[in-house]
Amino acid sequence: ATHGTGNGTIENDNGINFAASNVGGNLNATATLGNITESGTEALTVTGTSTFTTSASDADITLATTTNAFTGAVSLNTTGSGGNAEVIDASALNLGASTVGGTLSARAVTGDISNSGNLAITGAATFRTDADGSNIALDSSGNVFSSAVTLQADGGGEAFGNITFVDSAAVDFDSSASANGDLYINASTDGAVGGNLSVTATTGNITQNVALAVTGTSTFITGAA
């Protein structure tokens, strides 16, 4: 724990297993050879930004306690196709610049999901909001999703508010996340958005294999020359 706005930095030659921790400033954690995990249901509370990095190929980051409280942006960095990352925030989740070699699972229990830095995700990515009518805004211009992306409203049983999504390649609306480029809006009705929908494919096409039901405005942008 730190007092006031003090920062916390930890680097371990092996893995890191967090007990319950409170950091008033920023947290920077690097595991050189192992995984980064949390002990049981003990939560991390970080007022500033949080950066978690595994240096070994295929090492994971698993921050899956539902009472984690990350007030600032959370950055996740792994290497190797088996280097997966999972993060849960008890309220809203803001993802900072992150590079994940495997899959990414990001969940906000009571708030929205957004990103304040570019996301480069090699494996499949799932973004889940549990609160009905919550928003997902993945709008950084340098986002690179190399595999399929699922936007999930509480396990597919609730409705979204607004969705903003930017990818460097093509985007294909689909009823599942089975192929590279698929964007699966998994709500109470698949493809349904209760607010506004904005999707940008900076270098590819935008296509669909599932009907979209958008209550608000819809904006589709392709940036390729």
Task: Name each region found by the language model.
Residues A1-A225:
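Extracellular lectin-like interaction modules
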